[in-house]
Structure formats: C-alpha cells, structure tokens
C-alpha cells in the first residue's frame, strides 16, 4: 500500500462507496435499491474493517506454537483486540469503583444505639435502670400483646418467653420495693391512692382504731399497673439523684465556709505571743546532739558485712584463669581482624572497658589511716604495687629519726606547669613517690570530683614524661632513665582507669606533631615524639584493626618514613628508631608496612659503600658521605641499641660507632621482619630481592661480620620454598556433549499436553497448572485494580484542589467587588459632601 496514510484512507473509503459524488440526479423511473446504497449495519461493518486495516496495533493475533508446518494454513488463529478489552476493563472498574464509593460508610458498620453509652454524666446504675425501663416499655407495647390478650396476667418481671429478668443475680420484681414508704413520694395525684386513703379513714371513724384488726386494715393485694411502676421507678431515680446533688452542695458550702474563716483563724494565731524554749530544753538538746552525731558517723564508717563466697579449689581457680585468658585472647583477635561487637560496647571511647578493669580494688592505707579503710572501695580507685614503703618515705629518714620535711597537703596538678612547680623543690629520686602520693590522696572514693581530677592528671603525667625526654640528661642518664620507667609504670596503671581523657590528650599530641612536621619537616620534630610513640605502644592495644590512638600513630610514622629525605646520620637514627617502634606495634598483628621496607633499603644504600658494580642510585647516595669505610672494624663491640639522648648532639657526624650501631640495628630489623612478617606474604620474592643484592655487597665490604651472610642464606632458603604459580582458571570436569537418540511419539497429539500414564498424577498436575494460571491472572487483576484506584484517587484530589481554588478565587473576587462598590460609594458620598461645602 503505497502513498501516504491519508491518501490510502481516502482511496479505501472511495472504493467502498463511502465517499464520492453524492449530488447526482436520480432517475425517477428507477425505483429499485442501488447497489451503492448500504444499510446502516453494512456501512458500520465496512468502516470497522477499514479502521482495522489502518490501525494494525489494535488487533493482536496469537499463534499456536504447537501447530505444525503442515497444519499452519488450516489452523484458526486467535484474534484479539487489546485496546477494546482494556477500555472495557477500565469501564467495568470505574463502575465498581463508583459503587464502592457510594456505599462507603453506609453498610457493614456497627452503630451503638444503647442508651447512655457515651453519656459521662450518668452513673452505671442510672444507665442500667434507664435501659431496663425502655426495654420493659418496648416489650409491653409490642411483643407482650402478641402472645397474651390480658396484660395483667402473669408476673410483671417476666419477659415474653416466660423468663424472669435478673440484675446482678437478683430478681427484678418491683412488687415490694415501693410499699415501705421510704421514698417520700407525693401520691396525691393518684386517684386510686386518694380513694384508698378515704376508705381507710371512713372505716376508722365507724369502728375505731381498735376495732380494726390487721386483717381488716389490710386490703387485698392489687397488682400495680405499668404506668404506676414506671412512675415510681422514675420518681426513685430522681430522688436518688436529688440526694446526691444535696450532698455535693453541702460539701461545697462547707469548703467555702472553711476558706472564708481561714484568714480570721490565721490572724488570731499571729496575735499569740511566741514562747521561747526553756533553758532546760536547750541544755538537753545540746547534750543529745553530740551523741547523735557520733552515732551517725559510726553508722557511716561501719562497713557492712558482705556475704562470704565459697572457697574455690586450686583447680577451679586455675580453670577460671585459663577461661579468662582465652576470652581476652579471643577479644583481641576479633579486634585485630576488625570484628566489633556493637551490642557489647558500652562507650564509644578508645577501648571497650569491661568489668575486668574495675574489679579487685582494695582500700588504700596511707596518711588517712583507718578513715580510708572504713570507706567502701570505689571502682575507679588506683592500686599500686609495693606502695607500703613509699607511704612511709616522708615519715622517717633512713636512720630512723623523724624527717624534718613533711608534706601536709598534696595538690593535684591539672596542667603541666603546676606539676613542675610542685616537683622542682624535691630531688629526682622522690618524684615517683610524690606522683604516687598525689594519686592516692585524690582517690575517687575520697571526694566528689576526684575522678575528673585524676583523669586530667593522667594527661599531665604523660606531658611530663615527654618533657623529660626534651631535657639534656647526658650527664645523669641512669637517673633520668629510671625516673622515666617508673613514671611510665604509674601512667600505665592510671591508663587502665582513665582511658578516655588520656586518649583525647594523645590525639591532641598527634595533631600537634603533624602540624609541626608540615611546617618545618624533619626539623620540627623532637626526641619527645619518639618517646610518645613508644609510650603509646605500651599503653594501648597495638593489634586492633582500628584504634583511635594507635592507627593515627602508625599513619604518622609511615608519613615520616616516606617523606623525610634521609641524607644525614641524624635522620637515619630517627628513622631507625621509628622502624623499631613500628615493628613493636606489629609484633602480634604482623601487618606489612611498605614505608618500613623503603626506609630499610634507603638506609642500607646510604651506609654500605658501593663496589665496582655500583649503580647510579648508589652513586647519588655516596655524595652524602654516610658510608662506613674500613675493614678493621671490631664488630663484637658494636651495640645494636641506639641512645636517644645522643640523637641531637653536635659531634654526631664524627662518631663512626653510631653509624655502625645504626647499620647493625637495621640488619636486626630486617632479620626480624623476614622471620615474622615477610616470609608469609605472597609477594615475598618481590619484597626481598632488593635486599638480597644490598646484603651481598655488604658481605663483600664487611668480611668481619657474618650477619649479612646469614641473612642472604636465610633469604635463599626461603626463596626455594616460595613456589610462584601463574594465575589459572578454575579447573572443572569436562562435560560430554549429549548424544541421545531423538524420541518420537507414535500417537502424537498436539492438543495433548501430558503423556503421563498415571491418571491421578496427571489430573493433579493439571489442577496445579490451572491453579497457578488462575492465581497469576488474579494477581494481575488485583494490581490493575490497585493502580486504577490510585489514579482515581489522584484525579479526585486534583478535582478537589481545583474546586477549592476556584471557590477561593470566586470568594476573593466577590469580596473585591464588594470592596470596590463600597469604595466607590464612599468616594461619591465624600464628593457630595465636598460639593455641598
């Protein structure tokens, strides 16, 4: 079909006689029906056929995949119109939606029409009484008359089915409730009551009071009518309500009367003279007060007896200790592998402090004597070992005579300057004892606020240790070293109790070190920074996967080892000590640090002189004159340890022994890394090959030492067992190509879906397939209904919003019109007034 869509449509309409010349003059002789004149139905069918031809997407043909090639022409193809079907479904859904919307809140609801259900002013008795009254009225007017023509027969307390009505297990019979005369009712309105009273008076006048016996006075019992019963019930209810109202009014009046008399009573009480206590009463009270205070203090200081635990055997104690060690080791391994138990973490601090940090805190003995013993132990108390001798240090001298210097009060320094001012008047040997005395004096159990003071003092003590590292102590090295060790021991004990303030101060120190390094590079660092890294490694866990103090320290050490240009002996010593600290950090977790490998290679190339086969890199390193030249070196006297106090000495470059110590120290570091960390890595050959070449040169240059040769032999031995295999794909068992003989069905039927000989199983599978199909269709319809309801809801909301806005606009326009009219009216009146003037 060529041409445009419009031309084709016109041609099709013209070919079917639907368009063309229509004003041709018809012959009057020809009265038969023209072949071009169609009925309305035929015309509509033709239009539908043309519409389908020009709208192929409105028709969908479903082909049967099971129909063979030979039967394809004979098969009838299923033709559907999805557009029309969809529109019909939309119309049907809209009809159901409108019906559901119209019946909303109109059917299926339960309306509580019980009397007094939501009335808060009625009591439960009044509600039940009124319900009973209405029920009896309803029964008497409707159902009762259906079964009994005489309403007066039978009991009034029975319902239409002959059942007696009860309330709380008691009969609802009203015959005797109103004969006792306790209601105070006015019966003058009742005609029967007046006749009864008149009859009684006449009989009394005729026979006298004595002549009437009980039998004569008593009239035969007459059953009350329903109107009388209802009247008495209502009267009784009103009577009780009136009594309650009277009681409430009386209570309110009494309260108001007391309020009115309150001021007069108080004024009379104020006019009374005040009596002073006698001297005897004062003396007795003063005599009792001291005894009372003594008793209170005794009760405060009296230690309450705790229940004694069963004495454990040695096996139980040993087992508990082993279990505790296993638990702590498992926790450490979890932290090292980055496994954190969020539920068990109580604080978001540096470490998760458990109960083991706060148990077994015994009371201290010191300058407070028995008073401290009597105070219960606190969880935050700090316990030092071997403190008994330290407490008596200030009480007597070495020869047994009393000491002339006694410390009456010990301050708790909160900044480092205060601690220096306190310690400057005492010799260095007494500083640890003074620090212990400060800690014991300000135990948290002694006063409120001591815990915060000791937390700050812990950070001050760390600052003091770093301050000692900055001082020049080349003269008294042993005394300063002993002092630092004792202070570090005290700091470690304090760190177990005051971890959070100590960790915060450590992070501040780390930030300060990094700032100084960024500003001045290596020259902004100091020996105290090395001491800080070393002390931190002893205070905190270095094997954790992430730690708030250790992890920043490791990053800072790696930054120093990578960015500092090690072109002087002073820098090499600094880097060697950093390597030792980093190795100490990784003694348990055994993680690889690439910056450490880089520094060890750089330091060895700087210290070992090159041979004839030197490289360009070795030549550049020789310019710094750091290499150790000489074959007559006494290697047995070379110490691998490096002294921190000699790091910044002036004659450092002249000391060849320090260079030898640095070289031996680096060789020891390489040996430790190979043995504990590098050998287990898959990249061990790539890491160790540069060291192998350098160590071979060192073995040639320094034949007097066997350390380089031993390292080379160890490397070669490890490389033999280090098998390197290229990456390969995963091995799978080869799958054979299936070679099955084609299976033909002799009695093949394309309409038959199953060839199962078991009829029961076949029917069951058929039922399952049908159920699955129906379920799928139902879910599809439910989704369509849900989407349709959502669209309808959106349209309704849009319509509501549009109506609201149009209504508001109409109101605003109306108000504006009225305002304008009033304004014009006012202007006209104003103009008229002005013209009259």
Curated annotation (Swiss-Prot):
Q: Which InterPro entries does the protein's record reference?
A: Nop14
Keywords from UniProt, A to Z, are: Nucleus, Ribosome biogenesis, rRNA processing
Q: What is its main location?
A: nucleus
Q: What do the Gene Ontology cellular component annotations say?
A: Noc4p-Nop14p complex; nucleolus; small-subunit processome
Entry coiled-coil feature ranges: none
User: Composition bias, kind Basic and acidic residues: at what positions?
Assistant: 34-45, 743-761, 820-837
- Report residue spans for region: Disordered: 1-45, 131-162, 204-228, 373-406, 738-761, 815-837
Q: Where is the composition biased (Acidic residues)?
A: 150-160, 207-217, 377-394
Which BP terms does GO give this entry?
maturation of SSU-rRNA; ribosomal small subunit biogenesis
Q: Which GO terms describe its molecular function?
A: snoRNA binding
Where is the protein found, in the record's own terms?
Nucleus, Nucleolus
Q: What does the record note on quaternary structure?
A: Component of the ribosomal small subunit (SSU) processome.
Stated family: Belongs to the NOP14 family.
**Functional description taken from the UniProt entry:** Involved in nucleolar processing of pre-18S ribosomal RNA. Has a role in the nuclear export of 40S pre-ribosomal subunit to the cytoplasm.
The name under which this protein is listed is Probable nucleolar complex protein 14
